[in-house]
Regions:
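Conserved glycine(s) of the Walker
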Residues: 37-39
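Hydrophobic positions on the alpha1 helix immediately C-terminal to the Walker A/P-loop
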Residues: 42
Length: 176
């Protein structure tokens, strides 16, 4: 079903990502990564903030912003992970994307650490987190412009975090 939904999203100019998303200050903070990377952990620690998903997020273009820039929106989907409750059927403009992995090599005491990711590397990592399993030439020709727009429109960074109670306070400071 996710593969079919991905094909439909692609035809509409969007993508389905293996990602979670939490709405903070009116913007979706998207965290994309493979199974076991901490998507559900971050979603569960969101407190009272709306969780769009802990497993898969649809990303699609919306109206152009006031400054003429592309605005991308994150949408909740019916495909959730372990969070069967507390996920909202809503959307929000994408504020930032964090690429996450199961790596927890932080210095003790730091709730999180971020690093810039090059646009080319961002495209590659996001491509790996789509649900498109057979990438034909036609699919790639449709997908790459979407990913390029995504990378050009939204700040994408790598996030390593320790799942402490104050991890979102640290993320909010980083997104400030």
């Amino acid at each position: 079903m996710r593969t079919w939904f991905s094909v439909v999203m692609l035809a509409k100019g969007g993508i389905l990502l293996h990602a979670g998303a939490v709405v903070r200050a009116g913007r979706a903070i998207v965290f994309s990564g493979p199974s076991g990377s901490g998507k559900t952990t971050l979603a569960r620690r969101a407190g009272r903030h709306p969780v769009l998903s802990d497993e898969s997020v649809a990303i699609a273009p919306g109206p152009t912003g006031r400054n003429g820039n592309n605005v991308l929106y994150a949408f909740g989907t019916p495909f959730f992970g372990e969070m069967t409750e507390g996920v909202v059927n809503d959307h929000a403009p994408v504020g930032e994307v964090f690429l996450i992995s199961a790596n927890r090599s932080l210095v003790t005491g730091d709730p999180c650490r971020v690093a810039d990711v090059s646009p080319a590397h961002s495209v590659g990592e996001l491509l790996a987190q789509t649900f498109l399993r057979s990438l034909s030439r036609d699919a790639l020709e449709a997908l790459f412009p979407i990913l390029e727009t995504f990378v050009d429109s939204v700040r994408i960074r790598r996030l390593e975090f320790t799942p402490t109670p104050d991890v979102w306070r640290a993320i909010d400071e980083l997104c400030g």
